Amino acid sequence: MFSGSMVALITPLGEAGEVDYASLANLVEYHIAAGTDAIVAVGTSGESATLTVDEHVKVVLKTLEYAKGRIQVLAGTGANATHEAIIFSKLFSGTGVAGCLTVTPYYNKPTQEGLYQHYKAIAEATDLPQLLYNVPGRTAVDLLPETVARLAKFENIVGIKDATGDLSRVKKTRELCGEDFIQLSGDDATGLDFVAQGGHGVISVTANIAAADMATMFKLALSGQFEAAQKINARLMPLHRDLFVESNPIPVKWAAHQLGLIKHGYLRLPLTELSESAHPVVLQALKDANVLL
């Protein structure tokens, strides 16, 4: 259902802070041409936390419109209030969205039982396929494999994006949830190793600016050609590292602008533009990865 190189798509913004839909359309075409397996719109990299509800919905629907059925589009639907996450999931039902990526509630720090009840309520309220999203470095809660196993019993909870960087979880989650439960890495630096451990792919920040390389790398990996995949991964490692020199998506939006993929690299407060001292760091990473010659 979901596998390979899936991009955690950035949301282009204009000088006044408005969504730049022309650049968004360009990004969709870029990913289709590059062979990206799926687009995840309005997740962390898409600045979901600072878009209005209307903007959130419109960006997803416009991404679908631009894709024209040529690539899968998933919607970020996470919220730290369960009823809001349900509303988002229901809004995208019947639109053509392939599934939802739902981050664990942030700030309010629910228990494992609270996390279970949160996702249970969402699963029971919508028929869309749901991907759990565990990123404790941002949310301050960790969705444990045992809780994932309880949730995997719901037919429409089909997998997880795991951004813990803990490769031991791949095997444990597979043992608890079965081989058909989709496991996607949310950490570019360990994404290839994640697949080597039995994962199905990655939801990637790096793919925003190195889409063809990421798509090729994961096609090779999923066909068992890890040596060839590792050569690409080694070249991309400066990006995996330095696209996080400041908070994501600050560096990747700056890089995408430098590459001409988007018209501007603007963000919304409280995120600020990439500091000048970090410009040479990201620029060198682009050169080392052969993305910028």
Swiss-Prot record:
Pfam (any one): DHDPS
CDD domains: DHDPS
Record's catalysed reaction(s): L-aspartate 4-semialdehyde + pyruvate = (2S,4S)-4-hydroxy-2,3,4,5-tetrahydrodipicolinate + H2O + H(+)
Subcellular location: Cytoplasm
SUPFAM superfamilies in the cross-refs: Aldolase
Site (Part of a proton relay during catalysis): T44, Y107
Entry annotation: catalytic residues: Y133, K161
GO cellular component: cytosol
The protein's annotated pathway: Amino-acid biosynthesis; L-lysine biosynthesis via DAP pathway; (S)-tetrahydrodipicolinate from L-aspartate: step 3/4
SMART domains, per database record: DHDPS
Binding site for pyruvate: S45, I203
Keyword Nucleotide-binding: no
One of the record's GO molecular function terms: 4-hydroxy-tetrahydrodipicolinate synthase activity
GO biological process, one term: diaminopimelate biosynthetic process
Enzyme Commission number(s) of this protein: 4.3.3.7
Keywords of the record: Amino-acid biosynthesis, Cytoplasm, Diaminopimelate biosynthesis, Lyase, Lysine biosynthesis, Schiff base
PANTHER family: 4-HYDROXY-2-OXOGLUTARATE ALDOLASE, MITOCHONDRIAL, DIHYDRODIPICOLINATE SYNTHASE
Biological function: Catalyzes the condensation of (S)-aspartate-beta-semialdehyde [(S)-ASA] and pyruvate to 4-hydroxy-tetrahydrodipicolinate (HTPA).
Subunit description: Homotetramer; dimer of dimers.
Stored HAMAP family: DapA
Record-stated family: Belongs to the DapA family.
Protein name listed in UniProt: 4-hydroxy-tetrahydrodipicolinate synthase
